[in-house]
């Protein structure tokens, strides 16, 4: 063999593998599965791939709940005064020596801590809630919440990039329901109700503006709650703010005829409270006086409406 001769390479000849009868041999182009001794974590979904309310996970539709101390408050549109009404209901129940938690589940608007004037207080926000196993210790969570007039508050900061998943919302509600007498949830226009079981099974309260448009929206909103299997709601009528002088709002009797349901209230607007909220001072006008009547814009509440709503809630607890 000289330098121009190609060296011979010894080839190793193997006999073809013999497979047991009935089991085909793998082909060369077939991928060989990798051996894994763990379950790989799921790929994070993009915001466009996340399941919407119409595609709720099966677990969200079958989970049962035994809690009867959850109040879900919603409205057919924004600007009715729902957040102040929820806050004042929590405040009045706390004054009656009920331990109360107030949850901001309005992930579109949020800012309940700003509304109450406690945005600088240290405490847990909804964007910081982490429940990887769908479970949160209630006592531990209670101690991490900020306090407002004896009410524990779990606000949502909408400027945060992280929006809680439905099971984290469910876990937070259940944790606080286990350790408080009452849990009041400001659910905005109800975007989470279909996917969060405890929001559907709780006592439903609708804030309805006493105007033609407001009542039409309230009727549509009530139909939506009915389609999700919620119990019959308690409807609270709220007088519209900023109505021209000489033009009256829709009366309670007319509202009841249109909605074919009992309407509590009316809740009257408060100019002083509206000014405090718009200036970022929180709900202080109501707390400084005995006869409170919150409302306007994102505010609302009257002595009459709150008394009736409290009575309805306490009677429902007695029946439960």
Name the predicted role of every residue range.
Residues 64-116, 176:
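Walker A/P-loop phosphate-binding motif and the immediately C-terminal alpha-helix
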Residues 93-152:
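Phosphate-binding loop that captures ATP/GTP phosphates
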Residues 178, 191-212:
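Inter-motif core of Ras-like GTPase G domains
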Residues 182, 202-204, 234, 261, ...:
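Well-ordered beta-strand positions
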Residues 239-242, 252-284:
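Beta-strand-loop-alpha "switch" segments that mediate conformational coupling across diverse proteins
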């Amino acid at each position: 063999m000289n330098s121009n001769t190609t060296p011979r390479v010894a080839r190793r000849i193997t006999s073809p593998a013999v497979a047991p009868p009935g089991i085909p041999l793998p082909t060369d182009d077939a991928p060989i599965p990798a051996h894994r001794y763990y379950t790989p974590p799921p790929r994070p979904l993009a915001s466009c791939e996340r399941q919407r309310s119409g595609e709720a996970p099966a677990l969200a539709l079958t989970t049962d709940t035994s809690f009867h101390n959850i109040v879900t408050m919603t409205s057919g549109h924004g600007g009715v005064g729902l957040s102040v009404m929820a806050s004042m209901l929590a405040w009045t129940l706390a004054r009656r020596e009920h331990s109360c938690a107030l949850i901001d589940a309005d992930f579109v608007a949020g800012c309940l801590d700003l509304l109450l004037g406690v945005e600088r207080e240290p405490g847990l926000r909804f964007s910081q809630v982490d429940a990887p196993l769908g479970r949160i210790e209630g006592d531990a969570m209670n101690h991490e919440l900020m306090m407002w007039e004896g009410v524990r508050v779990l606000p949502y900061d909408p400027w945060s990039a992280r929006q809680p998943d439905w099971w984290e919302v469910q876990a937070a509600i259940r944790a606080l329901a286990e350790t408080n007498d009452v849990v009041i949830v400001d659910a905005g226009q109800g975007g989470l109700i279909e996917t969060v079981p405890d929001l559907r099974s709780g006592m439903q309260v609708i804030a309805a503006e006493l105007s033609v448009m407001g009542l039409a929206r309230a009727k549509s909103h009530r139909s939506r709650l009915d389609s999700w299997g919620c119990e019959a709601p308690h409807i609270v009528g709220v007088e519209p703010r900023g109505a021209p002088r000489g033009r009256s709002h829709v009366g309670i009797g007319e509202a009841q005829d249109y909605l074919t349901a009992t309407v509590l209230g009316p809740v009257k607007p408060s100019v002083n409270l509206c000014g405090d909220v718009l200036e970022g001072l929180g709900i202080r006008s109501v707390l400084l006086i005995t006869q409170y009547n919150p409302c306007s814009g994102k505010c609302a509440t009257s002595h009459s409406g709150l008394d009736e709503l409290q009575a309805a809630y306490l009677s429902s607890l007695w029946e439960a």
